[in-house]
Amino acid sequence: PNGPGSIQYSNGSQFSGSFKDGLKFNQGTYTFRDGTTARFQFLNDVPNGEGIINYKNGDVYQGSFKDGRRNGSGEIVFSDGFKFSGEFVDDVPNGNGVVVYLDQSKFSGFYKNGIREGKGSIISNEIKFDVNFKDDNFNGSGILIQGSNTFKNHYINGLRDGLSHHQYSDNSVFSGNYQKNEKHGEGVYIYP
């Protein structure tokens, strides 16, 4: 068939949209048995182009599809208000991405296979934190600015580990070592 039409599936889901040579083509909408709805652009029976999915739980994805999967730029707004926008490869965040949390703080950085990897920044009303990530944890150097205080730390698996340098708003300074987030070994405080 060619032109508009619909399909009722045995599992209770339904498709309505355009067909060309018997294949889904151009615009079409799925209504799934669980209440999830999806509107896609189709090419050769498969979602390719822009689309939007309204999940049963209230989450919404809007963005690009290729070969039936989220590929390219997209945004997910979760039912609790948490939001991710960025690049997807085969349904998984890969590339640059931005997360906006409920308190409106933001993470911006790079994702690899769905986890934070490489340079990233966390910004809120109170802090700015530039840090390296590995396997979704702080790893490597990081600089945290909180008001007039600056904290330069080295991290291993999310914990301060190694040389740290802290400069406080009263111009006092701490330099010393941390191990597993605890001060360890020698350190120096300098008071103004």
Residue ranges and their predicted role:
Residues 9, 30-32, 55, 78, ...:
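Position-specific recognition of the canonical hydrophobic site in helix A of tetratricopeptide repeat
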